[in-house]
């Protein structure tokens, strides 16, 4: 992953929430390569590089997020629960909403309270997709929450709106990145790797839907 950014661009001190997750780990390592001082905030400490300062905590708790944001220039908010269920039991819905939406609110409050200059939010392409889409760009409108198919899409949509609404308020600049499918070295979702291996070996005999559909 070659990010067109520099240490001067993101600032010398960066925090990655969800830093022990797949995207968070790769991002933290890339920031180290840029020469940044890197912190992570996660329920588990960062693994693999002693140069990273790990804050073990919950993004829903200001008492955990606030100290991690002290002296930080840029926060990369990747922490989230990826739950694609539609008919989840109430306790699961509360947990996903709590982490993905209320956790994002907490991160925004902490950024403002601690004077963080920049907040970059990992959103999802799913926030604007409620049917076939061709050639969409940043101007594509949000899908209606009611039409989004799962908890993850619904909560990411609400969280992204919170982040973008906070732009240029209390000295904070914000941005949202909407990746599609994300996979690569170190990914724990074995299904994606198996899918690609089967496809490469010509083992798929049935295609449902258009064979020209892409996820970019």
Regions found by a protein language model. Name each.
Residues 147-175:
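Active-site Tyr-X1-5-Lys
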Residues 102-152:
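Conserved Rossmann-fold NAD(P)-dependent oxidoreductase catalytic core, especially the SDR/UDP-sugar
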Residues 167-215:
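NAD(P)-dependent short-chain dehydrogenase/reductase
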Residues 82-85, 125-132, 180-183:
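Active-site segment of SDR-like NAD(P)-dependent oxidoreductases
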Residues 36-47:
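Conserved glycine-rich Rossmann-like NAD(P)H-binding loop of the short-chain dehydrogenase/reductase
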Residues 3-8, 12-34:
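N-terminal Rossmann NAD(P)H-binding glycine-rich loop of SDR-like oxidoreductase domains
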Residues 57-99, 110-113:
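NAD(P)H-binding glycine-rich loop region in Rossmannoid oxidoreductase-like domains
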């Amino acid at each position: 992953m070659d990010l067109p950014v520099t240490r001067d661009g993101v600032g010398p001190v960066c925090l990655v929430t969800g830093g022990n997750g797949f995207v968070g780990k790769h991002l933290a390592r890339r920031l180290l390569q840029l020469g940044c001082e890197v912190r992570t905030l996660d329920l588990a400490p960062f693994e693999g590089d002693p140069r990273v300062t790990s804050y073990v905590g919950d993004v829903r708790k200001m008492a955990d997020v606030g100290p991690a944001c002290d002296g930080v220039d840029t926060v990369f908010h990747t922490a989230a629960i990826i739950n694609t269920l539609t008919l989840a039991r109430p306790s699961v819905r509360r947990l996903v909403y709590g982490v993905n939406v209320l956790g994002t609110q907490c991160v925004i409050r902490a950024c403002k309270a601690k004077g963080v200059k920049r907040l970059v939010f990992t959103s999802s392409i799913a926030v604007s997709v409620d049917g076939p889409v061709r050639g969409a760009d940043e101007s594509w409108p949000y899908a209606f929450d009611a039409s989004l198919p799962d908890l993850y899409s619904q909560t990411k949509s609400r969280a992204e709106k919170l982040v973008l609404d906070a732009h240029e308020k209390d000295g904070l600049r914000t941005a949202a990145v909407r990746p599609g499918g994300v996979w690569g070295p170190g990914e724990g979702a074995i299904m994606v790797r198996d899918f690609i291996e089967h496809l490469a070996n010509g083992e798929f005999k049935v295609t449902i839907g258009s064979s020209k559909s892409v996820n970019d």
